[in-house]
Amino acid sequence: VAPLLSLYSQAGAEKGSELKISGKVSGRVDISVDADEARVSGRTALSLERLENPAAKLTLEGLAADIPFILDLRRKEGAGKPESSDLPEKGRFSLGRLKTPLLAFDGVEAALAAGPNRFEFEPLTLRLFGGRLEFGRTALFIDPEGGALTGRTSMRLDELDLAGLPFASGQVRLTGKAKLDFPEIELSRERLGIRGQGELRVFGGLIQLSNFAVEKPFSESRRISLDVDIVDIDLKKLTDEVPFGEVTGILRGEVRELTFSYGQPERFFLKVESVPRKGVPQTFSLKAVDNLTILSSGERASAGTSPLWMRFVRGFQYRKLGIVSTLRNDTFTLNGTIKEGGVEYLVKKPLFFGINVINRMPDKKISFREMMDRINRVGQSETGSKSKGG
């Protein structure tokens, strides 16, 4: 295989993007055509000692595959899809090691079978960040006329350790467990449909994920959508891990029609509210008030002019927190759910001492870029104050 890859390199592939590969491939193809049948069948054997993509930081070692195939070019859709008993050709797939910046697998093996216009893989289990990832029986179908690929499978993930994920930033430390249960996954050129749900046990509460779907999964313009339910998140545990400022209390909420395209959020409807719980205080630090005000208006609440005594108060009490936010057509809105006396509140104080955060521009809409700028400024107010004081 390596000599063939060298031709690609010499043909002008960008330096550093070339595949480095060593191994062998062989195959057999049988073609049968008569008045009743047009069939292409055969078998491909692949043995790769090592494949390396420096640009993607991907390394693959010890790949061995024996893949049979049968393409019945005259089989009509109405003839139906063959059952497992109609898959006469057996094969195998094994992988010694796969390593990427995000994942690493060792010792993967799977049996497969082929029938007319169909492949089927036996169930497969992988260890992933302390959890167990299971794929059920996977079937792939090929349309002989248009060449479209469809398929179905199932997937289950138990007890994945979020602390082990390679997505941690220097500002956020994510701990907890995750699990997914997708009893039915349907794949087509236009849509990846997923039935089931997932959950993340984080920050003393639960984040539930449901209604997953991927539109145009093979396109760069693919759209990923899901719904999210936020159940009893401990705000103290959450704000201990993000540079927002301390907030205490219990939070519930939902995110509907959360949609991503080209790696960025495209639309959502978010609503979160505090839930009183006996023995759990409800407080906002001054830094948290500043950062919430930055998100809602673009300006700090204290602006460096707050009385000196306020800087020594650990937390200001609040009676209720309620926020609604939407993203549509590159436009953000941010509003409070609490409206009293013609005033819209993001945070409402108790009857006596406490803190209010008022939305003074409830009808204002801002661009996605401006909201990203505000989010990037969150947590910087305290740093800026310290540098000025020094």
Spans of features found by a protein language model:
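Extended amphipathic, helix-rich lipid-handling scaffolds
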Residues: V1-L58, L63-R189, G193, F212-F260, ...
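Outer-membrane beta-barrel pore domains and translocons
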Residues: A45-S47, R156, E199-R201, E273, ...
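Outer-membrane beta-barrel and related beta-rich outer-membrane complex signature
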Residues: A56, V280-N291
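Short conserved micro-motifs at the rims of enzyme active sites and ligand-binding pockets
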Residues: L165-F167, L238-E241, Q282-L286, L334-I338, ...
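Short edge-strand/loop segments of extracellular domains
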Residues: V202-G205, E273-V280
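Flexible glycine-/small-residue-rich
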Residues: I230, S274, G336
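C-terminal structural cap/anchor segments
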Residues: E254-S261, P265-R277
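A cross-taxonomic marker for long C-terminal extensions/tails that follow the last structured domain
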Residues: F316-F352
